[in-house]
Amino acid sequence: MQPRLVIAGTHSGVGKTTVTLGLMAAFVEKGNIVQGFKCGPDYIDPSYHRAVTKRASRNLDSWMVSEDVVNDIFIEGCNGADLSIIEGVMGFYDGKASTSDKGSTADISLLLQAPVLLVVDISGMARSAAAVVKGFQQLNEKVKIAGVILNGAGSERHAEMCSEAIKEACGIPALGYLKKGDVPSIPERHLGLVPALERGEHDSLFSQLAAVVSRQFDLERIERLALEASALSRRTNLFQQTKRPSVVKIAVAYDAAFHFYYEENFTLLRQAGAELVYFSPLRGEDLPSHCDGLYLGGGFPEEFADELSQWIKDHPQLKKRVQSGLPTLAECGGYMFLGEQLTTTKGKTVEMAGVIPMVVQMENKLVSLGYRDVTPLDDSFLLSKGQQIRGHEFHYSKAVYTETERPAYFVKGLFGEGKEGYMSDHLLAGYTHLHFASEPAVATQWVKACEVYKNRRLHRGQVSQ
């Protein structure tokens, strides 16, 4: 059994995250082991999920990876959990195109045969709420909208009126409601959000959400709905292959400045024979001297520019190690970190690692957002020329090269295409967050490159510690 629910919304901003976190917190308080998932490529909401459930949340994205792999990511993630709660993205039917459900929350709910709770903002309406729900039921009659959550109620009586209308016209119950002002607003998705989550600064918010949801939601009926979901079977052997004994160590920067990683990337690397060794530049920790590879993920280096600049001064071996051939993948924030300088939106410029001949300028507006089809322009330790992988891009900065650029990828998105990133024989870096499950061979290729580096290092007498 894999008890599960999808929390969907009529539109962005309707309260999906509030309801999701409230349910997670309430079920955790009841003693349940709760697993979080997020539809789409977003990293921020999974950070919330992790803060509440104490389990790594996983992304379910039917554009970046195949439907079979989405199915298996879900099965892999919910292992050991009593209940899985899947937070939707945008409106229920919003996906890759305006005429298709592909990539939408509805798409994921059908793929996983999961019952759906639809969050509806009932502000300023009564019976009309039933018309809204009816439309969502009828647009694709294959989906299973099993109940609704009413948000923005003016009073308990207002929620009752809408509930009665929906039950009569749509045949499904309202299983909970939130009145205006019931709970504090979820903090904006600003740069300091994840560090604040890691410090536990929002724990009181989660407790308030749990209290309100426990009082105003029918948790027993919601749990019964989740238990009605039929068991899923694995469709691939992607996460079932015999794990190779660890043969190399890959250092992974992991702290408030570097924390945007897809969990499947870690899973596939371990399966291929890598031991992941985590270190935190923000805590002043050294790059592990015994590592055979380096993974610098995304995050918010601009938020910690001074601290990272000082770490680079105190740890010059990072530049030396990367330039000496350490197989290194740097994505988005990690890419920025390896540049020569970073200039904040306030005009302050700090020195960065100086590995890549570029300067990074932070902007006050979004520079790039969207899915990417990625094709490497040449052979590297991770990808062969022409080998394809998929990923996602989201950043507020621009990279300006100070020498001739050596772009890593040709990337194609919905609204354009072009070259991006930087590469050498042992370094692959760019703004795109790569999803290894879209091309699983990359994990094996990286581990093989690390083995070559390790053997060369040992031959030079640098014995592994």
Curated annotation (Swiss-Prot):
Q: Which residues form the GATase cobBQ-type domain?
A: 249-441
Name the UniProt key words of this record, in alphabetical order: ATP-binding, Cobalamin biosynthesis, Glutamine amidotransferase, Ligase, Magnesium, Nucleotide-binding
A Pfam family reported for this protein in Swiss-Prot or TrEMBL: GATase_3
GO function terms (MF aspect):
ATP binding; cobyrinic acid a,c-diamide synthase activity
Q: Which SUPFAM superfamilies match?
A: Class I glutamine amidotransferase-like (SSF52317), P-loop containing nucleoside triphosphate hydrolases (SSF52540)
GO BP, one annotated term: cobalamin biosynthetic process
Q: Which domain of life is it from?
A: Bacteria
Q: Which PROSITE patterns match?
A: GATASE_COBBQ
Q: Which cofactors are required for activity? A: Mg(2+)
- Which parts of the sequence are marked as the site Increases nucleophilicity of active site Cys? 433
EC primary class: ligase
Under catalytic activity, the entry for this protein gives: cob(II)yrinate + 2 L-glutamine + 2 ATP + 2 H2O = cob(II)yrinate a,c diamide + 2 L-glutamate + 2 ADP + 2 phosphate + 2 H(+)
- Which CDD domains would you find in this protein's record? CobB_N, GATase1_CobB
Q: In which pathway does it act?
A: Cofactor biosynthesis; adenosylcobalamin biosynthesis; cob(II)yrinate a,c-diamide from sirohydrochlorin (anaerobic route): step 10/10
InterPro entries assigned to the protein according to its UniProt record, in alphabetical order: CbiA/CobB_synth (IPR004484), Class_I_gatase-like (IPR029062), CobQ/CobB/MinD/ParA_Nub-bd_dom (IPR002586), GATase_3 (IPR011698), P-loop_NTPase (IPR027417)
> Which residues does the Swiss-Prot or TrEMBL record annotate as the active site?
332 (nucleophile)
Q: What is its EC number?
A: 6.3.5.11
Q: What is known of its domains?
A: Comprises of two domains. The C-terminal domain contains the binding site for glutamine and catalyzes the hydrolysis of this substrate to glutamate and ammonia. The N-terminal domain is anticipated to bind ATP and cobyrinate and catalyzes the ultimate synthesis of the diamide product. The ammonia produced via the glutaminase domain is probably translocated to the adjacent domain via a molecular tunnel, where it reacts with an activated intermediate.
Q: State the family named in the UniProt similarity comment for this chain.
A: Belongs to the CobB/CbiA family.
Anything else the record notes?
The a and c carboxylates of cobyrinate are activated for nucleophilic attack via formation of a phosphorylated intermediate by ATP. CbiA catalyzes first the amidation of the c-carboxylate, and then that of the a-carboxylate.
| Role according to the record | Catalyzes the ATP-dependent amidation of the two carboxylate groups at positions a and c of cobyrinate, using either L-glutamine or ammonia as the nitrogen source.
Q: What is this protein called?
A: Cobyrinate a,c-diamide synthase
Highest lineage ranks of the organism? Answer: Bacteria, Bacillati, Bacillota, Bacilli, Bacillales
